[in-house]
């Protein structure tokens, strides 16, 4: 909603789209429920498409389809915002209901400059800005310890439910041995930087 409001200073008409209809009531903004993998807009419907904090959540098998849709509806520009080289092993969660391991904050995809450019055939990047560390924030030993302990320090406060069953993610209880092991794993992560 914040970005939509800011964009009204640049564009007379703004369409705010999300999986659930955005709760925004402001002049010049039309709120729409939709899915980036199947946009219900005509070809070249928008001068500029802003797609931020979205593509990392799209299932990998639908990612190219989502990018093709952005290219299809953008008549001039597409502004894309994704985490740069995010370490998807960090902050995983485990669903207590079905046992599925979930990625951090529902992020299913990892991007670097080459991959992001390849996802948008026919578009030439005008500018690329990289933010974030762009390096691993964990290591294989820490990942193995977290997995053994059931990922107790994952991103359980995220909005997204389990990627397999949809259940709300709940932080597991851990005993003293698990706590000590996770303490060691966190320390290993800290000393690598």
What is each model feature region?
Residues 1-90:
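Conserved SAM-binding loop
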Residues 31, 37, 59-193:
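S-adenosyl-L-methionine-dependent methyltransferase catalytic module, highlighting the catalytic core
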């Amino acid at each position: 909603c914040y970005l939509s409001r800011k964009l009204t200073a640049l564009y007379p008409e703004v369409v705010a789209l999300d999986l659930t209809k955005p709760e925004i009531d402001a002049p010049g903004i039309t709120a729409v429920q939709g899915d980036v993998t199947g946009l219900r807009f005509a070809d070249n419907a928008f001068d500029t498409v802003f797609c931020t904090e979205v593509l990392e959540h799209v299932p990998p098998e639908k990612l190219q389809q989502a990018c093709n849709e952005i290219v299809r509806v953008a008549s001039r520009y597409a502004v894309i915002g994704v985490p740069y080289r995010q370490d998807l092993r960090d902050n995983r969660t485990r669903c207590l209901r079905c046992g599925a391991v979930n990625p951090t904050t529902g992020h299913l995809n990892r991007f670097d400059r080459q991959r992001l450019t390849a996802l948008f055939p026919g578009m030439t990047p005008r500018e690329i800005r990289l933010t974030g560390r762009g390096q691993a924030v964990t290591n294989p030993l820490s990942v193995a310890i977290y997995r053994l302990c059931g990922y107790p320090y994952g991103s359980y406060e995220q909005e997204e439910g389990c990627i397999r069953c949809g259940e709300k993610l709940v932080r597991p209880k851990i005993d003293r041995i698990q706590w000590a092991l996770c303490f060691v794993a966190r320390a290993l992560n800290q000393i690598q930087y």
